[in-house]
Regions:
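Active-site neighborhood of HAD-like aspartate-dependent phosphohydrolases
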Residues: 1-36
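Hydrophobic patch in the ABC ATPase nucleotide-binding domain
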Residues: 28, 56, 119
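Asp-based, Mg2+/Mn2+-dependent phosphohydrolase catalytic module
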Residues: 90-93, 106-217
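Short, acidic loop-to-helix structural element flanking the phosphoryl-transfer center
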Residues: 73-101, 107, 111
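Conserved donor sugar-nucleotide recognition element shared by glycan-biosynthetic enzymes
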Residues: 15, 43, 81, 138
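Conserved SAM-binding loop
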Residues: 8, 81, 99-102, 134, ...
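A metal-dependent, Asp-based hydrolase signature
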Residues: 40-73, 83, 90-93
Length: 217
């Protein structure tokens, strides 16, 4: 299973830009500390944090919609895949391995991103953060994905880039490979393996991560 933001697509800088624009409209400033808290959680939780942090007198739903619109515009202008990510997705698909995408992003942005990259058909299942009760770091999205794919959790491997996502995968009892493209390697220590980028990843390494995790278990 793949996360999307920071794994399939190089979107973390775009999320930062969207949030900067969102706050600038309210004469508020954005900080790296906010990014660290919000990275990897679903839209409602991220916006709820912003509203509480800045004591905004606005509804979560309205701000989520505004944030999504800003992000959609940035996707249409600047969206690009992470280096070597699509090659791995295609390799997994060609090997006839059941493949899911489980993203904290809302469905409209997931559909937009995958459609623009023309990779929707490479996934057997696509789940977004607004389709489960609790977002990452809760295990809900990965457990739901495994159930819908018909795969037991111990036979699942998750590829993540954020501490919240790694925590969700491990809470679901799954193996986890972390890509340190968006987060310092030291913050991803709960993963079974950490690599710097997809140029280090192939099917053999994925199988090795699964074996190592089972050996430790």
């Amino acid at each position: 299973m793949f996360d999307m933001d920071g794994v399939i697509i190089d979107s973390e800088p775009l999320w930062s830009k969207a949030e900067q624009q969102l706050l600038a409209r309210r004469n508020l400033s954005y900080s790296p500390q906010l990014k660290a808290v919000m990275m990897g959680i679903n839209s409602s939780e991220a916006v709820g944090f912003l509203i509480k942090h800045y004591n905004l007198q606005e509804s979560v739903g309205d701000v989520v919609e505004e944030r999504n619109q800003l992000m959609a515009g940035l996707f249409r202008q600047f969206l690009r895949p992470m280096p070597h990510a699509l090659q791995l997705v295609r390799s997994v698909h060609a090997a006839e391995i059941k493949t899911g995408l489980a993203s904290s992003s809302p469905k409209e942005l997931v559909d937009l991103a995958l459609g623009r990259l023309n990779i929707t058909g490479l996934f057997d299942l696509i789940l977004s953060g607004d389709q489960v009760a609790r977002g990452k770091p809760a295990a809900d999205i990965y457990l739901t994905a495994a159930r819908e794919l018909g795969v037991s959790h111990e036979n699942c491997l998750v590829i993540e880039d954020a501490p919240h996502g790694v925590a969700a995968a491990k809470a679901a009892g799954m193996c986890c490979l972390a890509i340190s493209t968006s987060t310092n390697e030291s913050e991803l220590g709960a993963a079974d393996r950490v690599v710097r980028g997809f140029d280090e990843v192939d099917l053999a390494l994925l199988q090795d991560v699964m074996r190592c995790s089972r050996d430790r278990g």
